[in-house]
């Protein structure tokens, strides 16, 4: 079977440009993927709801007080996950990464973070933020965030608390 390819040239939508947009067609109509988008959306909503419901069930550790040395927020969170055997919420992981990124270009960028912020205060801050993230976000908000971030899985911890 022989397929004919056509290319349609049309002026670019930018009126100040002399560029031309090209659309290539193989002569077949595009597949209707709207049903897949709706199914994916429903699946994402269900996953977000299950995730948020699960995170609400995980208790914040009460026996804390270890002095954990750390050079970055993400590094501290990794140590906390190992020490307490608990996951941190997606939103907490994203926030901690952003806090680390916010140090880029500062005078203290190369300085150990535990020499700037006392380890006990830093850990308490993470647990306070974690409690907010476990108890308050809606699964609808989570699904919207996940839909906009194709790599959202990388911020979801695979650690499950031991009971």
From Swiss-Prot:
Q: Which residues cross the membrane?
A: none
Q: Which domain of life is it from?
A: Eukaryota
Tell me, what's a Pfam family for it? RdDM_RDM1
Biological process GO annotation list? Answer: gene silencing by siRNA-directed DNA methylation; siRNA processing
Keyword field contains Nucleus: yes
Does the record carry Nucleus as a key word?
A: yes
Upon deletion of the gene, what happens? Impaired accumulation of siRNAs, reduced DNA methylation, and loss of transcriptional gene silencing at RdDM target loci. Impaired RNA polymerase V-chromatin associations (Pol V).
Q: Which key words tag this protein in UniProt?
A: DNA-binding, Nucleus
Q: Where in the cell is it found?
A: Nucleus, Nucleoplasm
Q: Where is this region: Disordered?
A: 1-36
- From the UniProt record, list the coiled-coil ranges: none
Q: Which InterPro entries match?
A: RDM1_plant (IPR015270), RDM1_sf (IPR036319)
GO MF terms held by the record: DNA binding
Known partners and oligomeric status: Homodimer. Interacts with AGO4, RPB205 and DRM2. Part of the chromatin-remodeling complex (DDR complex) that contains at least DRD1, DMS3 and RDM1. The DDR complex recruits/activates the RNA polymerases V and acts during siRNA-directed DNA methylation (RdDM).
Q: What is this protein called?
A: Protein RDM1
């Amino acid at each position: 079977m022989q397929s004919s390819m056509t290319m349609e040239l049309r002026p670019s939508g930018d009126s100040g440009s002399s560029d031309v947009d090209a659309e290539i067609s193989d002569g077949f109509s595009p597949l209707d993927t709207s049903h897949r988008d709706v199914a994916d959306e429903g699946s994402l909503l269900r996953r977000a709801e299950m995730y948020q419901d699960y995170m609400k069930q995980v208790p914040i550790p009460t026996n804390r007080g270890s002095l954990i040395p750390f050079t970055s927020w993400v590094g501290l969170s990794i140590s906390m996950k190992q020490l307490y055997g608990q996951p941190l919420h997606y939103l907490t992981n994203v926030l901690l990464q952003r806090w680390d990124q916010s140090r880029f270009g500062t005078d203290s960028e190369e300085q150990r973070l535990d020499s700037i912020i006392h380890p006990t205060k830093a850990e308490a801050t993470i647990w306070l933020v974690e409690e907010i993230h476990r108890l308050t976000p809606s699964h609808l908000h989570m699904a919207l965030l996940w839909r906009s971030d194709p790599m959202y899985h990388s911020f979801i911890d695979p650690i499950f608390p031991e009971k």
